Amino acid sequence: MVEASLRVSGSTNPISGRIVANGAKNSALPIMAACLLLNGSVVLAGMPDLRDVTVMSELITSLGGRISFLRNTKEKANHKVEINCDNLHNWAIPHEITSQMRASCLTLGPILTRMGRAEVALPGGCSIGSRPLDMHIWALQKLGAKVEVCGNYVKCSSSGKLVGCHIDFQSVSVGATENALMAAVMAHGTTTISNAAIEPEVADLAHFLVKAGAQISGIGTRTLQICGVQQLSGPSHTIIRDRMEAGTYALAAISTGGSVHIAGVTSEMLGCLAHELEGMGGKVTDVPDGLVVLRHSPQINPVVLHTAPYPGFPSDMQAQFAATACLARGTSQIHEHVFDRRFSYARELAKMGADIHVQGNTASIRGVDKLHGASVQAPDLRASAALLIAGLSAQGVTTISNVQTLYRGYEAMEEKLRACGAEVELVR
């Protein structure tokens, strides 16, 4: 994507309006990868039109798959995609594709299962610390694959079908759980995955595979049991809505003292985010077609957050909460326990007048009376969203460069915010 900037005029209008929640990127990408396992065409509804989805489409096409995209131009969300992988003819994915998206590593298990071998360049995506593939590789080896890392490539092969086994992860990993699950669904015998990730997006992948004919029990628990089947056939499936996107728009409303109606999600789907939004001074109310989030208290309250695997507080939301906490009455603390080096946004918020200090895995944020517009640079996807929230509540104009990272996770965000009264302009 061409380098772009956002020009944000803050402190003009509170965010107020209706936004339709999109399908979850963190569900869409592994489900697209799982389509590599299936016979026949798959129809996926609720698909977000994001840069990462485009890259995954290019990846599947490079292997011989066919993809057609039917866009929902009215809502600019929840599109339909048809994927057919009947005629795969390639098992190697070049660095030009994988360097753009970390989720490319999720294709290791499916390609290996389908083709008997896989070669995937080490993935890219946001630079938010060390996210090694060790657990992915270990799980595939447990299933009988031969795996070696040669330079920048992971090479996998198997002499026959993978064989079911017991995979006991030493720590919780969403990606490794998903890779192991996809590799196990057509393995010979039974596989048990212990200490599995239980994020809603992992459960969505499992439910999709069950629709395709997989035999999986324990969905939504720390122990998954998979009985391998001979083949899987393409179902229709609707991707769950994006709780990270919904939480981001909710914080934009709280930061600006506004109100946003988010269609398609519930407070239950937000999980602990709903509790933390209310703790900051917001009010979260379920309505027939979604929920309404508004600023309930006259001031923003400080928070203490500890990121953790689901059902704990998601690491993907801490930057946005940090931006909102910059204007809180008091001192907030955010403790990052999932990824290292995920406070790269702190220096940029400080340019806007934030009183934020990072020591180790903890950011301390003392609320200030106001933020001021500045020229800042977005270091990664969620930091982009955080800087946009800060810009909306700052006085003056904020210019956010490198904002193309934003569109890895948020579709037409500036258009949706403009419809809610924000003054936001995309500059290419």
UniProtKB/Swiss-Prot annotation:
Q: What is the lineage of its organism?
A: Bacteria, Pseudomonadati, Pseudomonadota, Alphaproteobacteria, Rickettsiales
Q: What's this protein's name?
A: UDP-N-acetylglucosamine 1-carboxyvinyltransferase
Its BP terms in the Gene Ontology are: cell division; cell wall organization; peptidoglycan biosynthetic process; regulation of cell shape; UDP-N-acetylgalactosamine biosynthetic process
* Stored NCBIfam families: murA (TIGR01072), PRK09369.1 (NF006873)
- Provide the alphabetized UniProt keywords: Cell cycle, Cell division, Cell shape, Cell wall biogenesis/degradation, Cytoplasm, Peptidoglycan synthesis, Pyruvate, Transferase
Q: Which GO terms describe its molecular function?
A: UDP-N-acetylglucosamine 1-carboxyvinyltransferase activity
Q: Which family does it belong to?
A: Belongs to the EPSP synthase family. MurA subfamily.
Q: Where in the cell is it found?
A: Cytoplasm
Q: Which GO terms describe its cellular component?
A: cytoplasm
Its encoding gene is what?
murA
